[in-house]
Design a protein with these regions (language model features):
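Juxtamembrane regions of bacterial inner-membrane/periplasmic proteins
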Residues: 2-239
Length: 239
């Protein structure tokens, strides 16, 4: 009888653990759904308003504070009509040639990148689309991790569903990093070329587009070879 009592006494403990585990799982799912819904509201609001700041901008500010370095932010969002078509075309040619036709992910480009990485036996360029980069800038950080990629892959379809391609491009051109504390086309064109974004010529636009992959290290004046490659891509597309 004593043995039976011990067995019976052990069952409630197992049942309690299962209940707690179930509660944790349900709580985690509810939290994830709540965050997803909050992101959906934020993305929907971006149809009409520009973000006052972004996750990447906040990351840079915190990093500067922790390192005791000065931080000066230059961020002046402007409508797409005030951004030179030269820059719009240069950025699309450089970063996401199939931007207008895909739905957030460029599977063809991803396959090419994967094949190149396998051949080189190391990870190379990311192959992220403009939409993916926008999501990273708005909601995530510059840190590379599987968790960040997972969150990115859940948010990209939402952005594509709720925003037009023109609005996605407009937001992207206004929030991406173009140098230390320099965010967006207007700030970048004023800083590097001393003209508003609406007045950028083809060469200036190509040089700005060329530094996007590594904005804290590259300088437009040093991008002769890559900027020419971008100009060639633009010409092939009819831009």
């Amino acid at each position: 009888m004593a043995i039976k009592k011990r067995k019976a006494g052990g069952r409630p403990s197992v049942t309690k653990k299962k209940k707690w585990l179930r509660k944790i799982v349900i709580g985690g799912l509810l939290l994830a759904l709540s965050l997803y819904a909050l992101c959906a509201v934020c993305v929907l609001a971006l149809r009409w308003i520009n973000p006052p700041t972004t996750a990447v901008q906040m990351e840079r500010r915190v990093s500067a504070i922790l390192k005791g370095r000065p931080y000066h932010k230059h961020y002046d969002p402007v409508p797409l009509r005030r951004i030179s078509p030269n820059l719009q075309h240069a950025v699309v040619a450089a970063e996401d040639g199939r931007f207008r036709t895909h739905h957030g992910f460029d599977w063809i480009e991803m396959q090419k990148v994967l094949e190149q990485d396998i051949q080189r036996h190391k990870l190379g360029r990311g192959g992220s689309t403009i939409t993916q980069q926008l999501v990273k800038n708005l909601f995530l950080t510059t840190e590379r991790s599987l968790v960040r990629k997972g969150v990115e892959f859940t948010l990209v379809p939402m952005v594509e569903a709720l925003l037009t391609k023109d609005r996605i491009l407009e937001l992207y051109l206004n929030v991406i990093e173009w140098g230390p504390g320099i965010y967006g086309a207007e700030a970048a064109s004023e800083y590097y070329d001393h003209v508003p974004a609406s007045e950028l010529n083809r060469e200036q636009a190509a040089r700005l587009a060329a530094i996007i992959p590594s904005p804290l290290k590259r300088k437009p004046a040093q991008m002769n070879e890559y900027s020419q490659e971008i100009l060639d891509r633009m010409a092939k597309t009819g831009w």
